[in-house]
């Protein structure tokens, strides 16, 4: 009972149609979860293991689909974060705000272009078992007849703990991401990077009225071992963590995601 993803360069589309009319009747809860997924897509691709740290293939055509953070994906990721910071709250407050819905569609595509090359890492890896093993949780706004955690919600609930964990790998990049999300980093030190970025993510989670931890889905400390087991099989994503992440690290990350606020 673990969600997973399938990725291959042959699955990439050649055309995308971004029409805000298609999202006009989207419930605000769905817009919130999807928008926070955009946030984490961009944040994870920007903080992923740098592409130069990946094993070099025999020839360029054999590179993995997810290559790690790189200068081109960075451009898309940072702009996506800026778009989310400005327009996601507007979409949540007013579904008739066509400019905001259109800009969020663009922001989603920016983030997708970035992580489609760089990849995502720990928040998504941790989200898969949380979404796959949930029992008895029915999210507002989804008209669901079965237990489910919306994808973006299952991702973002782990992002603050991961930010605090990964910040020592590249404090300046984490501060850049926080600034793109609207944080004031003028007096910030490298040691502050993880906390500043985590708190900025939590700020948007609260604005979007998101659950404050995986306890809200019904999970407890006793469930952490099986959630860790479900994460360890996500090798494609774990390889992109900027820091070595095994069972011990995941255990602590899940523990820190039980209750954020």
Regions found by a protein language model. Give the residues of each.
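A glycine/threonine-rich phosphate-anchoring loop and its flanking beta-alpha core
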Residues: 1-65, 169, 175-176
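Short alpha-helical scaffolding segments that buttress acidic/His motifs in well-ordered protein cores
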Residues: 39-43, 101-112, 126, 159, ...
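Active-site segments that bind and position negatively charged phosphate/pyrophosphate groups
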Residues: 51-195, 199
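C-terminal charged capping/lid subdomain of soluble metabolic enzymes
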Residues: 174-261
């Amino acid at each position: 009972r673990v969600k997973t993803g399938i990725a291959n360069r042959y699955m990439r589309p050649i055309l995308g149609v971004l029409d805000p009319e298609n999202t006009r009747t989207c419930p605000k809860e769905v817009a919130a979860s999807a928008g926070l997924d955009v946030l984490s897509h961009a944040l994870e691709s920007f903080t992923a293991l740098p592409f130069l740290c990946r094993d070099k293939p025999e020839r360029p055509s054999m590179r993995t689909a997810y290559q790690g953070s790189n200068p081109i994906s960075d451009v898309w990721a940072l702009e996506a974060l800026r778009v989310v910071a400005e327009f996601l709250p507007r979409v949540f407050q007013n579904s008739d705000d066509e400019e905001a819905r259109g800009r969020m569609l663009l922001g989603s595509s920016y983030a997708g272009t970035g992580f489609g090359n760089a990849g995502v890492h720990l928040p998504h890896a941790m989200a898969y078992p949380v979404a796959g093993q949930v029992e008895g949780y029915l999210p507002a706004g989804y008209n669901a007849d079965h237990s489910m955690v919306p994808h973006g919600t299952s991702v973002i609930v782990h992002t603050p703990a991961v930010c605090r964990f990964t910040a020592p790998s590249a404090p300046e990049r984490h501060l850049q991401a926080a600034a793109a999300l609207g944080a004031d980093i003028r007096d910030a030190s490298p040691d502050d990077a993880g906390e500043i970025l985590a708190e900025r993510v939590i700020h948007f989670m609260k604005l979007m009225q998101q659950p404050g931890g995986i306890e809200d889905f019904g999970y407890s400390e006793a469930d952490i071992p099986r959630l860790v087991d479900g994460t360890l099989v996500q090798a494609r994503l774990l390889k992109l963590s900027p820091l070595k992440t095994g069972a011990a690290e995941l255990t602590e990350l899940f523990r820190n995601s039980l209750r954020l606020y």
